[in-house]
A protein has these predicted regions:
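Iron-sulfur cluster-binding electron-transfer modules in prokaryotic oxidoreductases
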Residues: 1-220
Length: 220
């Protein structure tokens, strides 16, 4: 698991962007820990501090999509106080999964508009590449890339697109010399648990076919 990979919290500073960073643990720590580990390496390379939350639950997006509002609220009661505590210590929040970012940026604030703590978390939640763009604008991103990436096919996550932050992943990848980013702006069919449940798996595969087909044609 990703939490075991880190072994203990890391605390760094990101000045002069006046932002600190907390990486929100998520499903990627259990199923694809390498993604979280790679993100840590990228941030390390750029001198960005990283710390895992010590107490947390799922962001609640899968339960929200199933209409289980009681569990969503249960997760909120665990997550929000912990994140607010870290924010008050000077940290910002980043999650590797767009759905998690969207949950804290948009869904929970809409569900709890009068909760000041939910609104505070909203203001300090960032997509990882959005955060890197902030660093770049402040002149703090390490752009001394040693290897070209060639052609990169990027399927724009639906839950990232609706955050209205722009194609920040493309913007960062495009900084690497000799890199061509091809964007696919179609749904992957995954949608949280939709792509893994027995009752919806076949439908999710059908939705994903155009994305897979385009990726193959692009010959990345």
């Amino acid at each position: 698991m990703f939490a075991k990979y880190l072994k203990k919290p890391w605390i760094w500073t990101t000045e002069p962007t006046c932002r600190n960073f907390t990486r929100k643990h998520s499903v990627k720590g259990k199923r694809t820990p390498d993604i979280g580990q790679d993100l840590i390496k990228v941030f390390e390379h750029n001198g960005i501090p990283v710390r895992l939350t010590e107490k947390e639950e799922c962001c609640g997006m899968p339960k929200l999509e199933q209409g289980d509002l009681e569990t969503v609220d249960k997760y909120r009661q665990t997550n929000i106080p912990e994140l607010v505590r870290l924010i008050d210590e000077g940290w910002d929040i980043v999650a590797a999964i767009p759905s998690c970012v969207l949950m804290f940026k948009q869904e929970l604030p809409l569900m709890y508009p009068d909760d000041p703590d939910v609104q505070k978390v909203k203001q300090h939640m960032f997509d990882p590449f959005e955060y890197l763009v902030h660093r770049h604008k402040a002149g703090l991103l390490n752009t001394e890339f040693s290897q070209e990436l060639g052609k990169v096919v990027w399927q724009v996550p639906c839950h990232q697109r609706v955050q209205n932050i722009g194609p920040k992943t493309r913007d960062v990848l495009a900084l690497v010399p000799g890199t061509e980013v091809e964007m696919i702006e179609r749904c992957s069919g995954h949608d949280g648990t939709y792509g893994v449940r027995a009752g919806t798996y076949d439908k999710s595969q059908k939705i994903a076919r155009p994305v897979i087909s385009r990726a193959k044609k692009m010959d990345a």
